[in-house]
Amino acid sequence: MIMDNKQFADFCADLESGRIRVAEKIDGNWKVNAWIKEAILEGFKLGTLTDMSEGQFPFIDKDTIPVRKFTVEDKVRIVPGGSSVRRGAYLAPSVIMMPPAYVNIGAYVDEGSMIDSHALVGSCAQIGKNVHIAAAAQIGGVLEPVGAMPVIIEDGVFIGGNCGIYEGVLVREGAVLGSGVIINKSTAVYDAVHGDYIRPDETGRIVIPAGAVVVAGSRPIRKGPGAEAGIHVYTPVIVKYRDGKTDASVELEDLLR
């Protein structure tokens, strides 16, 4: 893909308006628009290093991908204190960012969602409506390979503090992830409700089911010196499924207590 600076600027404007996005849900299935990732990578190649310093704070980055500027008309709340949104990221009206937080290029954050302090929404991550990303949670970026599915958090999900969701993991609607839950494509997630491990789907990614309530857990090593020493390895555990009657944070608090 070959672009000039004006074409790339127009492309970023389309991303920022929500007219185009890296992944979209079609007939219940998520589809990657690989050409958008290709264009983002082209933008990095186009750019030259430039001084973006502000006052006493030194910043140097590619001139094609500066910090995105917002106006009151965008209806996005970015509370003062060190947050940053990169060019080419979409934040819908009514999104709230608490400082400091960061949203990278290609990310899509839908209406009513909150990004709390010290949280990251990585490149191309797709965040649904009314999602709560709690303090220090990390939603990983997936820019390469271009055909790889980004991390996707569907509507109404609660991501607890210090969670880490990486490598194209899909979290379905209404799920609740307790503080400290870490999931990537090779993480063994145990479903204690159904008595089995969640297996990667046909694309190789882990899918957390809709309404699942997930907490950090462990499982024992079964053989070798680790077993003899009583060592356990980290394993997220689905402890129940939400029934839709209880607020996510209250339900999680009750389970943990």
Residues of each region from the PLM?
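Structural signal for interior beta-strand "rungs" in well-ordered beta-sheet cores
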Residues: 72, 77-222, 226, 238
